[in-house]
């Protein structure tokens, strides 16, 4: 018997509601990729024996200070299985190497240096609590040298190297692991770069699939986490750069400034939710394109970015929800690298931003937001003076 039109409408409605429920439920659980991801932090002792050998011939320093405190961030790790993982790491000293009293003159010049690595990490479980960990892979060494009166005493350098290491891990539980670790990157005679050794202690936090009861609670909470949002924004230096400077300097240095400054700009942003908790936290990815005009000379340039986004919806009321957001290290393209005579690096850079906003309306279909932003390459290249984006006001809608 042919299906009646009313029955067809009912079937279609049930299907749509079921599909929407599945979609909402799927965002309350970590994806397969995220459930194998982890993040980490190590602090410890770094050594690279900088000496007068790094200086240009004819120059000597009476005092070379090599601070040894350093940190290493595991920006992203991925567990293939219990025997093998891969990591992206970023390591830098807390304070820079300094050359003082050069050729009898009272100079105090810093050498900026950091190491980014992509490594494979084999692991050998010893028992349920301890494991031996290895490390081997690719390293990118970046050094910004020193100069006096446009005379380079230590050249800038960016080159590929290797990174090897190993350590012991103690598994507190299925999410937390404590680590003791050592790593090594060899010297490069051509670049006059000494070897780098790092000895550290730290932790690793692993994401895991959530229990079914937690997923059910998160997905059926009744709080709205918009699936997608599209925004258009306008940036202006008319209010000044006070907000940028406040959050990039003491007493609250939680963001970055920049030597090149933007006068105005227009942005287009797309964001998509991929995970949310019951009420407050959500994780999203986004994409943006933007047009900018510099503050000093009115130079035009463009950017395009992909980025992760952390959102914290801290206040929920009947008419609006209020949130704070923070995004860091979004891979980006920038069309111009010298802006108002400021050398910002290469055309590959990173986007960072922080802000606050609201979702409004019965189904939270309307969005308004303001934020500050920043572009820099994270010292992947010797020139890294950064671009400061002033307050940006955005309007958008969700769907």
Residue ranges and their predicted role:
Residues 23-78, 196-271, 396-398:
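Short glycine/proline- and aromatic-enriched beta-strand/turn motifs that initiate or cap beta-hairpins
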Residues 37, 70-74, 114-118, 138, ...:
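Hydrophobic, lipid-facing positions within transmembrane beta-strands of outer-membrane proteins
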Residues 37-41, 84-88, 116, 132-136, ...:
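Transmembrane beta-strands of outer-membrane beta-barrel proteins
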Residues 45, 78, 122-124, 168-170, ...:
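Residue-level signature of outer-membrane beta-barrel architecture
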Residues 47, 75-147, 262-334:
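Gram-negative (and chloroplast) outer-membrane scaffold detector with strong preference
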Residues 51-58, 98-104, 144-152, 190-197, ...:
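Outer-membrane beta-barrel translocator domains and adjoining extracellular loop/strand segments
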Residues 83-86, 128-132, 170-180, 209-214, ...:
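Repeated loop/turn-to-beta-strand initiation elements of outer-membrane beta-barrel proteins
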């Amino acid at each position: 018997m042919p299906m009646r039109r009313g029955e067809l409408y009912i079937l279609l409605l049930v299907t749509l509601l079921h599909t929407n429920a599945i979609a909402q439920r799927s965002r309350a659980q970590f994806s397969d990729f995220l459930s194998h991801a982890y993040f980490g932090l190590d602090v410890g002792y770094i050594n690279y024996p900088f000496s007068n050998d790094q200086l240009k011939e004819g120059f000597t320093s009476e005092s070379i200070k090599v601070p040894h405190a350093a940190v290493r961030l595991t920006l992203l790790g991925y567990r293939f299985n219990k025997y093998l993982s891969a990591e992206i790491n970023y390591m830098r000293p807390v304070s820079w190497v300094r050359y003082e009293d050069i050729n009898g003159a009272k100079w105090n010049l810093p050498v900026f240096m950091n190491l980014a690595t992509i490594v494979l990490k084999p692991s050998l479980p010893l028992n349920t609590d301890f494991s031996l960990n290895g490390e081997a892979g690719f390293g990118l060494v970046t050094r910004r040298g020193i100069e006096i009166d446009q005379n380079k005493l230590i050249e800038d350098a960016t080159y590929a190297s290797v990174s090897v290491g190993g350590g012991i891990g103690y598994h507190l539980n299925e999410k937390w692991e404590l680590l003791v670790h050592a790593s090594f990157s060899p010297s490069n005679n051509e670049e006059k770069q000494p070897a780098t050794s790092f000895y550290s202690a730290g932790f690793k936090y692993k994401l895991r699939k959530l229990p079914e009861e937690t997923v059910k609670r998160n997905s059926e909470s009744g709080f709205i986490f918009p699936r997608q949002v599209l925004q258009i924004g306008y940036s202006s230096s008319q209010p000044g750069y006070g907000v940028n400077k406040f959050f990039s300097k003491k007493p609250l240095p939680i963001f970055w400034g920049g030597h090149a400054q933007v006068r105005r700009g227009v942005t287009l942003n797309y964001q998509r939710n991929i995970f949310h908790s019951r009420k407050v936290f959500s994780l999203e990815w986004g994409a943006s394109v933007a047009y900018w005009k510099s503050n000093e000379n009115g130079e035009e340039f463009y950017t395009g970015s992909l980025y992760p986004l952390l959102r914290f919806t801290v206040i929920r009321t009947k008419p609006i929800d209020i949130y704070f957001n923070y995004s860091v290290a979004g891979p980006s393209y920038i069309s111009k690298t010298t802006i108002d005579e400021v050398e910002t690096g290469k055309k590959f850079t990173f986007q960072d931003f922080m802000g606050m906003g609201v979702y409004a309306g019965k189904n939270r279909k309307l969005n308004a937001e303001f934020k500050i932003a920043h572009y820099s390459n994270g010292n992947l290249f010797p020139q890294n003076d950064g671009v400061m984006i002033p307050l940006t006001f955005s309007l958008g809608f969700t769907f």
